[in-house]
């Protein structure tokens, strides 16, 4: 897997903006990615030093479409802690 395929998109919410003050940023990541891949991808893409990577798997939910039940897609999320003094400017001003 290419390192630029690992990070899908940044996750921006109120909770994540509070975490950004503590140098923690959240990204949606590819299903097959592991912590080493995520760390390398963030360090190469944003020129920062990653201290820690926490990963979560959020399962999909069942929704109703008329009489039918469908399963929504799940999500894989990574919370990245950066070294003190480093910032990702992608999240600023949001």
Curated annotation (Swiss-Prot):
GO terms for biological process: translation. Part of the 50S ribosomal subunit. Contacts protein L29, and trigger factor when it is bound to the ribosome. The keyword Oxidoreductase does not apply. PANTHER family: 60S RIBOSOMAL PROTEIN L23A. One of its GO terms (cellular component) is ribonucleoprotein complex. Gene3D superfamilies: 3.30.70.330. One of its GO terms (molecular function) is rRNA binding. One of the early assembly proteins it binds 23S rRNA. One of the proteins that surrounds the polypeptide exit tunnel on the outside of the ribosome. Forms the main docking site for trigger factor binding to the ribosome. Pfam families: Ribosomal_L23. InterPro entries: Nucleotide-bd_a/b_plait_sf, Ribosomal_uL23-like, Ribosomal_uL23/eL15/eS24_sf, Ribosomal_uL23_CS. Keywords: Ribonucleoprotein, Ribosomal protein, RNA-binding, rRNA-binding. Disulfide bonds: none annotated. Belongs to the universal ribosomal protein uL23 family. This is Large ribosomal subunit protein uL23.
